Each structure stands twice: as structure tokens, then as C-alpha cells.
Swiss-Prot record:
Gene3D superfamilies: 3.30.1380.10. Signal peptide: none annotated. One of its GO terms (cellular component) is extracellular space. PANTHER family: HEDGEHOG (PTHR11889), PROTEIN HEDGEHOG (PTHR11889:SF31). It is found in: Cell membrane; Secreted, Extracellular space. Keywords: Autocatalytic cleavage, Calcium, Cell membrane, Developmental protein, Hydrolase, Membrane, Metal-binding, Protease, Secreted, Zinc. This is Tiggy-winkle hedgehog protein. It comes from Pseudorasbora parva. Ca(2+) 1 binds at T19, E20.
């Protein structure tokens, strides 16, 4: 929740989106933590890539 709150504080009206938490399609490298359910892919609700670090 702290990351989502930080996003809302930095950019009012923008929400954090989790786009993938488990990879069953093989989109990540073989060593990816997505296969263990220990990684997530995130974006912002406005999908403004200039906000991504």
C-alpha cells in the first residue's frame, strides 16, 4: 500500500496498476521471480511512461 499511496501523493488521480504477478506465458527470463509469484509488473493508471523509473 505504501507504494500506491506514494503514487497518489505524487500524481493526484493516478493509481498504481499491477499488470502481472505470475508468468504462465513465458514472457520473462528463466530466472525471473515471476515464476515463483515473488515479482510484479506495475504501471500507472494513466500509462504515462515518463513516470516510470
Amino acid at each position: 500500500n505504501s507504494l500506491a499511496i506514494s503514487v497518489m501523493n505524487q500524481w493526484p488521480g493516478v493509481k498504481l496498476r499491477v499488470t502481472e504477478g505470475w508468468d504462465e506465458d513465458g514472457h520473462h527470463s528463466k530466472e525471473s521471480l515471476h515464476y515463483e509469484g515473488r515479482a510484479v509488473d506495475i504501471t500507472t493508471s494513466d500509462r504515462d511512461k515518463s513516470k516510470y523509473g
